[in-house]
Amino acid sequence: MVRSSHRFRSSSKEVIAGPVTWTPFLVWDGRVNESSVDIAATAPVRKHVPMTSSFALAGANVLVAGATGGLGSRFVGQLVAAGAHVTAVGRDHGRLEALDLPAGQTLALDLRLPNACVAAVDAAAGRGPLDLVVNATGVVAFGTVADVTIDTMEELFLTNVFVPIMLSQSALPHMAPGSAIVNISGVIAEQNLPGMATYGASKAALRSFQEGFAREARRQKVRVLDTRPPHTETGLASRAIQGTAPNFAQGLDPDTVVSIILQAVTDGAKDLGSAAFASDR
C-alpha cells in the first residue's frame, strides 16, 4: 500500500481529505457525498436517439468528462454546435461556467473520487438514456523510471486508468443499444518512449482495458471506441504532474482532432489509431 492525498472511502467510511492509506483494491461503494456535488434536482426526460452508422449528433444525450480541459472543452463546443444535449463534468468551476451551457448541464466534480463517476452518469442519465460518453480526462508526467515517484505513478493510473474504468462501469447500465463510449489513450499507447514510460504504461493499460471491455459491451450493442491521436496542442504537456516535457514537434490542432473523433463516432468506427490523424499534421 502507498500513501496518498486523494479522497477515498470504503463502504463503511465517509469521504475524508488529506493523507490516507490507500490500496487499489479498495471497495468502491458508489455513494456520493452530497456536499461535494451540485446536480440539478429535476431534468426533462428525453426520447432516446439510437446511434447507427449514420447517427446524427443532433438531439443526442451526451456526457463529456474532463470538459474543462483542452480537448474536453472542444468536445463540448462541437457537440453543442451539432445540436447535442451535453452534460459537462469537470473540476474547475470557472472553466465550466465559461462553457456557457444552460443551468443543470454542468457538474463540478472530481471524478477521482470513487463515487463521483456514478454521480456524473446519474446527472446525464436523468434526461434519458445516454447516446454518447466521452472521457477526456487525463494527466501526464515526464521522467525516467528511476526518477518518477510512487505518488506520480499512483496519480497517473488513478486518472488515466481507474477513472475511465469507473466511468465506463457506471455508464453501461444507462446506455441503450447503439450508443458509444469514447476514450483517448493516445499514440503513446501504440509505442512507448523513454522519459514517458510510466505515462505510456497508464495509457497502454487504458487501451488494453478497452479491448476487453469492447467485447463485453457489444453484447449490449454499445460501441467502445479507443482513439489514439498523436501529440496535440492542448497545453497538457505544460501541466505535467512531474517533470518537464521534451521539445515536441508542433502538435495537431485540437479542434481538428475532436472533429476527426466525432466523425468516427458518427461513422460507426470501432477503433481510431494514430494513422487516422496523420493527414492533419
Where are these regions (language model features)?
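C-terminal helical subdomain
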Residues: 219, 226-227, 242-281
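Conserved glycine-rich cofactor-binding loop
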Residues: 68-69
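Active-site loop immediately N-terminal to the catalytic Tyr-X3-Lys motif
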Residues: 146, 193-197
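Active-site helix of classical SDR
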Residues: 168, 202
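Conserved NAD(P)H cofactor-binding loop of Rossmann-fold oxidoreductase domains
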Residues: 136-141
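Substrate-binding pocket helix/loop in short-chain dehydrogenase/reductase
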Residues: 144-145, 152-154
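Residue(s) in the substrate-gating loop at a strand-loop-helix junction
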Residues: 186
